[in-house]
Curated annotation (Swiss-Prot):
Family indicated by similarity: Belongs to the CRISP family.
Miscellaneous remark of the record: Negative results: does not show any toxic, hemorrhagic or edematogenic activities in mice. Does not degrade fibrinogen or azocasein. Does not induce platelet aggregation, or inhibit collagen, ADP thrombin or ristocetin-induced platelet aggregation. It is not yet known if this protein blocks ion channels.
Protein name (record): Cysteine-rich venom protein
Chief location of this protein within or outside the cell: secreted
Subcellular location(s) of the protein: Secreted
Tissue: Expressed by the venom gland.
Post-translational modification as stated in the protein's UniProt record: Contains 8 disulfide bonds.
GO annotations of cellular component type: extracellular region
Top-level taxonomic group: Eukaryota
Species the sequence originates in: Philodryas patagoniensis
Amino acid sequence: VDFDSESPRRPEIQ
């Protein structure tokens, strides 16, 4: 369910 381990619920928005 998690896109990024560092983000709670966000895709890679860098």
